Amino acid sequence: MEKKRYNVLFIQVDQWGEKFLNFTGNDKIMTPTINQLARDGVTYSNCYSTCPVCIPARRSLMTGLFPKAHGDRVYSDRMKMPSVTTLAEAFHQAGYHTMAVGKLHVYPQRNRIGFQDVILQEEGRYEFGGPDDYQIWLGENGYIGQEFLHGMGNNTYYTRTWPLGENAHPTTWATGQMVKQIKRRDPEKPAFFYLSYTFPHPPLVPLSEYWNMYSDQDIQEPEYGDWEDESFIFKELMEAARYYSHKEMIRAKKAYYAQCTHIDHQIRLVIGALKEEGILDDTILVFTSDHGEMLFDHGMVGKRTFYENSAHIPLIFSGKPIVDIRGKIDDRIACLEDIMPTLLDLCNIQVPDTVEGRSLFEKERRDFLYGEISEGYRATRMIRMENYKLIYYPYGNKIQIFDILQDKNELHDLSDKDEFKNVKEEMLIRL
Protein backbone atom coordinates (compact mmCIF):
# COMPACT_ATOMS: atom_id res chain seq x y z
CA MET A 1 0.00 0.00 0.00
CA GLU A 2 1.38 3.40 -1.03
CA LYS A 3 2.21 5.67 1.88
CA LYS A 4 0.44 9.01 2.26
CA ARG A 5 2.09 12.05 0.65
CA TYR A 6 0.90 15.09 2.58
CA ASN A 7 0.88 18.64 1.30
CA VAL A 8 3.24 21.05 3.08
CA LEU A 9 2.84 24.75 3.85
CA PHE A 10 6.26 25.94 5.01
CA ILE A 11 6.18 29.45 6.50
CA GLN A 12 9.59 31.07 6.86
CA VAL A 13 9.96 34.46 8.53
CA ASP A 14 13.02 36.69 8.61
CA GLN A 15 14.76 37.74 11.83
CA TRP A 16 12.01 36.64 14.24
CA GLY A 17 13.43 35.14 17.42
CA GLU A 18 11.72 32.62 19.71
CA LYS A 19 11.51 35.29 22.41
CA PHE A 20 9.07 37.40 20.40
CA LEU A 21 6.04 35.12 20.42
CA ASN A 22 3.08 35.19 22.77
CA PHE A 23 2.92 31.43 23.34
CA THR A 24 6.57 31.31 24.48
CA GLY A 25 5.78 33.69 27.34
CA ASN A 26 5.96 37.18 25.84
CA ASP A 27 2.66 38.72 26.95
CA LYS A 28 3.39 42.04 25.23
CA ILE A 29 3.12 40.69 21.69
CA MET A 30 -0.01 39.43 19.92
CA THR A 31 0.45 36.26 17.84
CA PRO A 32 -2.89 34.39 18.05
CA THR A 33 -2.48 32.43 14.81
CA ILE A 34 0.96 31.11 15.70
CA ASN A 35 -0.29 30.33 19.20
CA GLN A 36 -2.92 28.12 17.58
CA LEU A 37 -0.34 26.40 15.38
CA ALA A 38 1.60 25.54 18.54
CA ARG A 39 -1.51 24.18 20.27
CA ASP A 40 -2.31 22.04 17.22
CA GLY A 41 1.17 20.62 16.73
CA VAL A 42 4.61 20.07 18.22
CA THR A 43 6.91 22.91 19.26
CA TYR A 44 10.68 22.47 19.46
CA SER A 45 11.55 24.77 22.33
CA ASN A 46 15.34 24.57 21.90
CA CYS A 47 15.81 25.14 18.19
CA TYR A 48 18.83 27.14 17.02
CA SER A 49 20.26 28.75 13.95
CA THR A 50 23.79 27.33 13.74
CA CYS A 51 24.90 30.41 11.82
CA PRO A 52 22.43 33.23 12.57
CA VAL A 53 23.09 35.20 9.40
CA CYS A 54 20.61 35.39 6.50
CA ILE A 55 22.33 33.52 3.67
CA PRO A 56 24.19 30.82 5.64
CA ALA A 57 21.06 30.02 7.66
CA ARG A 58 18.94 29.62 4.53
CA ARG A 59 21.58 27.44 2.88
CA SER A 60 21.47 25.17 5.94
CA LEU A 61 17.67 25.05 5.83
CA MET A 62 17.50 24.19 2.14
CA THR A 63 20.32 21.60 2.12
CA GLY A 64 20.36 20.06 5.60
CA LEU A 65 24.08 20.88 5.71
CA PHE A 66 25.95 22.62 8.50
CA PRO A 67 27.89 25.80 7.59
CA LYS A 68 31.24 24.02 7.50
CA ALA A 69 29.86 21.69 4.81
CA HIS A 70 27.92 24.16 2.66
CA GLY A 71 30.76 26.67 2.77
CA ASP A 72 29.28 29.89 4.14
CA ARG A 73 29.50 31.17 7.70
CA VAL A 74 29.88 34.85 6.81
CA TYR A 75 27.40 36.29 4.26
CA SER A 76 28.68 35.17 0.89
CA ASP A 77 26.18 36.83 -1.42
CA ARG A 78 27.93 35.63 -4.59
CA MET A 79 28.36 32.01 -3.55
CA LYS A 80 26.32 29.46 -5.47
CA MET A 81 24.35 26.74 -3.73
CA PRO A 82 26.29 23.51 -3.14
CA SER A 83 25.72 20.69 -5.61
CA VAL A 84 23.45 18.60 -3.41
CA THR A 85 19.74 17.79 -3.46
CA THR A 86 17.84 20.69 -1.91
CA LEU A 87 14.66 20.48 0.14
CA ALA A 88 12.62 21.69 -2.83
CA GLU A 89 14.34 19.26 -5.22
CA ALA A 90 13.62 16.34 -2.90
CA PHE A 91 9.92 17.18 -2.96
CA HIS A 92 9.96 17.77 -6.72
CA GLN A 93 11.67 14.43 -7.37
CA ALA A 94 9.02 12.76 -5.21
CA GLY A 95 6.28 14.05 -7.50
CA TYR A 96 5.28 17.21 -5.68
CA HIS A 97 4.28 20.52 -7.26
CA THR A 98 6.81 22.86 -5.62
CA MET A 99 5.99 26.56 -5.28
CA ALA A 100 7.79 29.42 -3.54
CA VAL A 101 6.73 32.98 -2.75
CA GLY A 102 8.99 35.58 -1.15
CA LYS A 103 12.64 35.59 -0.23
CA LEU A 104 15.04 32.83 -1.33
CA HIS A 105 18.30 34.81 -0.87
CA VAL A 106 20.33 32.68 -3.26
CA TYR A 107 22.81 33.46 -6.03
CA PRO A 108 22.10 33.87 -8.86
CA GLN A 109 18.90 35.54 -7.69
CA ARG A 110 16.68 33.63 -10.13
CA ASN A 111 18.08 30.23 -9.17
CA ARG A 112 14.96 28.20 -8.40
CA ILE A 113 16.82 25.70 -6.14
CA GLY A 114 14.26 23.02 -7.04
CA PHE A 115 11.04 25.03 -7.04
CA GLN A 116 8.95 24.79 -10.21
CA ASP A 117 7.20 28.11 -9.60
CA VAL A 118 8.85 31.08 -7.88
CA ILE A 119 7.34 34.49 -7.13
CA LEU A 120 10.36 36.41 -5.90
CA GLN A 121 10.56 39.22 -3.34
CA GLU A 122 14.10 40.09 -2.29
CA GLU A 123 14.03 43.36 -0.29
CA GLY A 124 15.06 45.62 -3.14
CA ARG A 125 18.49 44.08 -3.68
CA TYR A 126 19.01 45.10 -7.31
CA GLU A 127 22.69 44.16 -7.17
CA PHE A 128 21.70 40.48 -7.17
CA GLY A 129 19.97 40.64 -10.54
CA GLY A 130 16.67 42.44 -9.96
CA PRO A 131 14.06 43.54 -10.38
CA ASP A 132 12.19 40.84 -8.53
CA ASP A 133 8.50 40.04 -9.02
CA TYR A 134 7.38 42.36 -6.25
CA GLN A 135 9.19 45.29 -7.87
CA ILE A 136 7.65 44.43 -11.23
CA TRP A 137 4.21 44.39 -9.58
CA LEU A 138 4.85 47.80 -7.99
CA GLY A 139 5.68 49.24 -11.41
CA GLU A 140 2.59 47.74 -12.99
CA ASN A 141 0.32 49.09 -10.25
CA GLY A 142 1.34 52.73 -10.03
CA TYR A 143 4.11 52.44 -7.43
CA ILE A 144 7.19 52.40 -9.67
CA GLY A 145 10.31 53.40 -7.74
CA GLN A 146 8.40 53.76 -4.46
CA GLU A 147 9.48 50.60 -2.64
CA PHE A 148 11.63 52.66 -0.27
CA LEU A 149 9.55 55.84 -0.27
CA HIS A 150 9.42 55.43 3.51
CA GLY A 151 13.14 56.24 3.71
CA MET A 152 13.98 53.47 6.20
CA GLY A 153 16.94 51.16 5.64
CA ASN A 154 17.15 47.36 5.60
CA ASN A 155 19.46 47.37 8.62
CA THR A 156 18.41 50.45 10.57
CA TYR A 157 16.02 50.78 13.49
CA TYR A 158 14.32 54.08 12.86
CA THR A 159 10.66 53.66 12.04
CA ARG A 160 7.67 55.17 10.31
CA THR A 161 4.39 53.71 9.14
CA TRP A 162 3.99 52.26 5.65
CA PRO A 163 3.26 55.13 3.21
CA LEU A 164 1.70 53.22 0.30
CA GLY A 165 -1.52 51.22 0.01
CA GLU A 166 -2.00 48.18 2.22
CA ASN A 167 -1.99 45.89 -0.82
CA ALA A 168 1.53 47.10 -1.63
CA HIS A 169 3.00 46.25 1.78
CA PRO A 170 5.49 43.39 1.29
CA THR A 171 3.78 41.19 3.89
CA THR A 172 0.29 41.65 2.45
CA TRP A 173 1.57 41.24 -1.11
CA ALA A 174 3.39 37.97 -0.36
CA THR A 175 0.28 36.57 1.31
CA GLY A 176 -1.87 37.39 -1.71
CA GLN A 177 0.62 35.76 -4.04
CA MET A 178 0.71 32.57 -1.98
CA VAL A 179 -3.09 32.38 -1.90
CA LYS A 180 -3.01 32.53 -5.72
CA GLN A 181 -0.41 29.76 -5.83
CA ILE A 182 -2.58 27.56 -3.62
CA LYS A 183 -5.53 28.06 -5.94
CA ARG A 184 -3.51 27.36 -9.10
CA ARG A 185 -1.67 24.27 -7.86
CA ASP A 186 -1.69 21.05 -9.86
CA PRO A 187 -4.67 19.13 -8.40
CA GLU A 188 -3.17 15.80 -9.46
CA LYS A 189 -0.09 16.18 -7.28
CA PRO A 190 0.67 16.84 -3.62
CA ALA A 191 1.99 20.37 -3.10
CA PHE A 192 4.98 21.90 -1.32
CA PHE A 193 4.21 25.57 -0.65
CA TYR A 194 7.09 27.72 0.65
CA LEU A 195 6.05 31.17 1.90
CA SER A 196 9.09 33.23 2.89
CA TYR A 197 8.23 36.62 4.39
CA THR A 198 10.88 39.37 4.32
CA PHE A 199 9.66 40.78 7.65
CA PRO A 200 9.88 41.47 10.61
CA HIS A 201 13.49 42.15 9.47
CA PRO A 202 13.95 45.92 9.04
CA PRO A 203 12.94 48.26 7.52
CA LEU A 204 10.54 48.93 10.40
CA VAL A 205 7.56 50.17 8.40
CA PRO A 206 4.39 48.63 9.85
CA LEU A 207 0.92 49.37 8.56
CA SER A 208 -0.77 52.08 10.64
CA GLU A 209 -3.40 49.55 11.75
CA TYR A 210 -0.75 47.42 13.44
CA TRP A 211 1.38 50.28 14.71
CA ASN A 212 -1.69 51.60 16.52
CA MET A 213 -2.02 48.30 18.38
CA TYR A 214 1.28 48.99 20.15
CA SER A 215 1.93 52.73 19.99
CA ASP A 216 0.33 53.51 23.37
CA GLN A 217 1.17 50.21 25.07
CA ASP A 218 3.86 49.62 27.65
CA ILE A 219 6.60 47.39 26.30
CA GLN A 220 9.69 45.69 27.70
CA GLU A 221 12.77 47.77 28.37
CA PRO A 222 16.06 46.56 26.86
CA GLU A 223 17.81 44.05 29.14
CA TYR A 224 21.46 44.11 30.14
CA GLY A 225 23.59 41.51 31.88
CA ASP A 226 26.43 41.70 34.37
CA TRP A 227 29.02 41.05 31.67
CA GLU A 228 28.87 43.87 29.07
CA ASP A 229 32.31 45.41 29.63
CA GLU A 230 34.85 47.33 27.56
CA SER A 231 36.17 44.26 25.75
CA PHE A 232 36.93 44.88 22.09
CA ILE A 233 34.44 42.29 20.85
CA PHE A 234 31.58 43.72 22.91
CA LYS A 235 32.33 47.21 21.62
CA GLU A 236 32.13 45.84 18.10
CA LEU A 237 28.86 44.00 18.70
CA MET A 238 27.29 47.04 20.37
CA GLU A 239 28.47 49.59 17.82
CA ALA A 240 25.36 49.56 15.60
CA ALA A 241 22.96 50.14 18.51
CA ARG A 242 24.71 53.01 20.25
CA TYR A 243 23.34 55.72 17.95
CA TYR A 244 19.71 55.27 19.06
CA SER A 245 18.05 57.17 21.88
CA HIS A 246 15.94 55.37 24.45
CA LYS A 247 12.79 56.72 22.77
CA GLU A 248 13.95 55.38 19.40
CA MET A 249 14.69 51.97 20.94
CA ILE A 250 11.18 51.67 22.36
CA ARG A 251 9.61 52.84 19.09
CA ALA A 252 11.69 50.28 17.19
CA LYS A 253 10.54 47.46 19.45
CA LYS A 254 6.88 48.49 19.04
CA ALA A 255 7.27 48.66 15.26
CA TYR A 256 8.94 45.25 15.24
CA TYR A 257 6.09 43.78 17.29
CA ALA A 258 3.59 45.40 14.91
CA GLN A 259 5.27 43.73 11.92
CA CYS A 260 5.16 40.38 13.72
CA THR A 261 1.43 40.71 14.43
CA HIS A 262 0.78 41.68 10.81
CA ILE A 263 2.46 38.48 9.63
CA ASP A 264 0.53 36.45 12.20
CA HIS A 265 -2.78 37.76 10.88
CA GLN A 266 -1.74 37.15 7.27
CA ILE A 267 -0.86 33.53 8.01
CA ARG A 268 -4.49 33.01 8.99
CA LEU A 269 -5.51 34.06 5.46
CA VAL A 270 -3.17 31.51 3.90
CA ILE A 271 -4.49 28.74 6.13
CA GLY A 272 -8.00 29.87 5.18
CA ALA A 273 -7.12 29.40 1.50
CA LEU A 274 -6.06 25.81 2.21
CA LYS A 275 -9.39 25.23 3.93
CA GLU A 276 -11.36 26.77 1.05
CA GLU A 277 -9.55 24.46 -1.37
CA GLY A 278 -10.39 21.45 0.77
CA ILE A 279 -6.77 20.45 1.42
CA LEU A 280 -6.11 21.78 4.93
CA ASP A 281 -6.68 18.41 6.61
CA ASP A 282 -4.02 16.85 4.38
CA THR A 283 -1.44 19.60 4.92
CA ILE A 284 1.50 19.77 7.32
CA LEU A 285 2.12 23.32 8.52
CA VAL A 286 5.64 24.45 9.43
CA PHE A 287 6.67 27.74 11.03
CA THR A 288 10.25 28.86 11.61
CA SER A 289 12.74 31.70 11.16
CA ASP A 290 16.24 31.92 9.73
CA HIS A 291 17.51 33.62 12.90
CA GLY A 292 16.39 36.06 15.56
CA GLU A 293 16.88 39.72 16.48
CA MET A 294 18.77 41.28 19.42
CA LEU A 295 16.43 44.32 19.43
CA PHE A 296 18.63 46.35 21.82
CA ASP A 297 19.01 43.69 24.52
CA HIS A 298 22.61 43.69 25.77
CA GLY A 299 23.08 46.90 23.78
CA MET A 300 22.92 45.11 20.42
CA VAL A 301 20.74 44.99 17.32
CA GLY A 302 20.37 42.54 14.46
CA LYS A 303 21.80 39.04 14.45
CA ARG A 304 25.33 37.61 13.98
CA THR A 305 25.64 36.63 17.64
CA PHE A 306 24.86 33.46 19.59
CA TYR A 307 22.88 35.14 22.34
CA GLU A 308 19.35 33.77 22.67
CA ASN A 309 17.64 36.72 20.95
CA SER A 310 19.71 36.13 17.83
CA ALA A 311 20.26 32.36 17.66
CA HIS A 312 17.21 30.81 19.36
CA ILE A 313 14.44 30.43 16.78
CA PRO A 314 10.86 29.13 16.78
CA LEU A 315 10.07 25.79 15.16
CA ILE A 316 6.55 24.37 14.95
CA PHE A 317 5.18 21.40 13.01
CA SER A 318 1.40 21.54 13.01
CA GLY A 319 -1.74 20.36 11.26
CA LYS A 320 -4.09 17.40 11.23
CA PRO A 321 -1.54 14.92 9.78
CA ILE A 322 0.36 15.07 13.09
CA VAL A 323 -2.66 15.33 15.39
CA ASP A 324 -1.30 12.47 17.54
CA ILE A 325 1.29 14.81 19.03
CA ARG A 326 -0.97 17.84 19.28
CA GLY A 327 0.17 20.35 21.90
CA LYS A 328 3.51 18.65 22.56
CA ILE A 329 6.59 20.65 23.56
CA ASP A 330 9.82 18.84 22.69
CA ASP A 331 12.87 20.26 24.50
CA ARG A 332 15.57 18.40 22.56
CA ILE A 333 18.32 20.55 21.01
CA ALA A 334 17.31 21.13 17.40
CA CYS A 335 18.51 23.27 14.50
CA LEU A 336 17.61 24.44 11.00
CA GLU A 337 19.52 21.53 9.49
CA ASP A 338 17.01 19.13 11.10
CA ILE A 339 13.98 20.53 9.27
CA MET A 340 14.72 18.93 5.89
CA PRO A 341 15.04 15.32 7.14
CA THR A 342 12.08 15.78 9.51
CA LEU A 343 9.77 17.03 6.77
CA LEU A 344 10.86 14.36 4.31
CA ASP A 345 10.26 11.68 6.93
CA LEU A 346 6.77 13.02 7.64
CA CYS A 347 5.97 12.89 3.92
CA ASN A 348 7.50 9.43 3.43
CA ILE A 349 10.23 10.71 1.12
CA GLN A 350 13.76 9.30 1.20
CA VAL A 351 16.25 11.63 2.86
CA PRO A 352 19.29 12.35 0.62
CA ASP A 353 22.58 10.88 1.85
CA THR A 354 24.14 14.35 1.86
CA VAL A 355 21.88 15.63 4.67
CA GLU A 356 23.71 16.18 7.98
CA GLY A 357 20.70 17.14 10.11
CA ARG A 358 18.58 14.49 11.79
CA SER A 359 14.86 13.82 11.87
CA LEU A 360 13.28 15.27 14.98
CA PHE A 361 10.91 12.33 15.19
CA GLU A 362 13.77 9.96 15.97
CA LYS A 363 14.18 8.97 19.62
CA GLU A 364 17.90 9.67 19.65
CA ARG A 365 18.87 13.17 20.80
CA ARG A 366 22.12 15.01 20.16
CA ASP A 367 24.34 15.71 23.17
CA PHE A 368 25.37 19.13 21.95
CA LEU A 369 25.12 21.55 19.04
CA TYR A 370 28.00 23.46 17.47
CA GLY A 371 27.53 26.85 15.83
CA GLU A 372 29.87 29.21 14.02
CA ILE A 373 29.68 32.74 12.67
CA SER A 374 32.13 34.80 10.69
CA GLU A 375 35.90 34.90 10.53
CA GLY A 376 38.63 37.28 11.59
CA TYR A 377 38.14 39.52 14.63
CA ARG A 378 34.36 38.98 14.71
CA ALA A 379 34.57 35.19 14.61
CA THR A 380 32.23 33.54 17.11
CA ARG A 381 31.68 29.91 18.06
CA MET A 382 29.00 28.26 20.21
CA ILE A 383 28.39 25.02 22.05
CA ARG A 384 24.84 24.39 23.27
CA MET A 385 24.33 21.49 25.67
CA GLU A 386 21.28 20.42 27.66
CA ASN A 387 21.32 23.24 30.21
CA TYR A 388 24.29 25.37 29.24
CA LYS A 389 25.62 27.45 26.40
CA LEU A 390 29.23 28.41 25.75
CA ILE A 391 30.05 31.36 23.49
CA TYR A 392 33.66 31.73 22.38
CA TYR A 393 35.30 34.72 20.68
CA PRO A 394 38.74 33.59 19.37
CA TYR A 395 39.90 37.20 18.97
CA GLY A 396 40.81 38.06 22.54
CA ASN A 397 40.14 34.50 23.73
CA LYS A 398 36.85 35.57 25.33
CA ILE A 399 34.65 32.82 26.81
CA GLN A 400 31.13 33.10 28.20
CA ILE A 401 28.94 30.43 29.80
CA PHE A 402 25.23 30.78 30.52
CA ASP A 403 22.79 28.52 32.34
CA ILE A 404 19.97 28.75 29.80
CA LEU A 405 17.59 26.73 31.95
CA GLN A 406 17.82 29.19 34.86
CA ASP A 407 18.89 32.34 33.02
CA LYS A 408 17.18 32.41 29.62
CA ASN A 409 17.93 36.10 29.12
CA GLU A 410 21.67 35.53 29.67
CA LEU A 411 22.10 38.11 32.39
CA HIS A 412 24.83 36.23 34.30
CA ASP A 413 28.09 35.00 32.79
CA LEU A 414 29.29 31.93 34.72
CA SER A 415 32.61 31.40 32.96
CA ASP A 416 34.71 32.62 35.91
CA LYS A 417 32.71 30.85 38.61
CA ASP A 418 34.62 28.02 40.31
CA GLU A 419 31.49 25.89 40.69
CA PHE A 420 31.14 25.78 36.88
CA LYS A 421 34.76 24.84 36.17
CA ASN A 422 33.88 21.26 35.16
CA VAL A 423 31.06 22.46 32.90
CA LYS A 424 33.45 24.87 31.23
CA GLU A 425 36.09 22.20 30.65
CA GLU A 426 33.57 19.77 29.18
CA MET A 427 32.20 22.38 26.79
CA LEU A 428 35.66 23.51 25.69
CA ILE A 429 36.43 19.91 24.74
CA ARG A 430 33.33 19.93 22.52
CA LEU A 431 34.46 23.19 20.95
Named regions from a protein language model:
Residues 1-393, 398-399, 408-429:
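Formylglycine-dependent sulfatase
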Residues 405:
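Residues forming the ATP-binding cleft of Hanks-type serine/threonine protein kinase domains
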